[in-house]
A protein has these predicted regions:
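Short, surface-exposed ligand-recognition loops at beta-strand->loop->(often short) alpha-helix junctions
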Residues: 11-20
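Active-site-flanking beta-strand signature of metal-NTP-handling nucleotidyl enzymes
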Residues: 5-11
Length: 95
């Protein structure tokens, strides 16, 4: 089964702060890395634009990624509406 890589950009929504996002996303991270299909889940904050974040993710399969999206902790993060998704790239490792 092919692994799935994700690169996603998040931007803090109006009325929220990067501090709020970091607190919530750290909780999301702590639960996500325990998911069976999660190989890697890295959260990075842009140095020059602190209201922007990048997620680097590696999943065992598309089904594992979907299970992550459906997980209660992911849905709870989405419900906070702290960030908007600026892009999502599904990637395949070639070397």
């Amino acid at each position: 089964m092919k692994k799935l890589w994700i690169s996603a950009g998040l931007v803090t929504t109006q009325g929220h702060t990067a501090v709020e996002v970091k607190e919530a996303i750290r909780l999301l991270h702590s639960k996500t890395i325990q998911e069976a299909g999660c190989i890697r889940f890295e959260v990075l904050q842009h140095q020059d634009e602190p209201n922007k974040f990048t997620l680097w993710e590696e999943w065992t399969s598309e089904a594992a990624l979907q299970a992550h999206y459906d997980a209660p902790h992911t849905q709870a993060y989405f419900a906070l509406s702290l960030t908007d998704v600026s892009y999502i790239e599904k990637l395949e490792q070639i070397a």
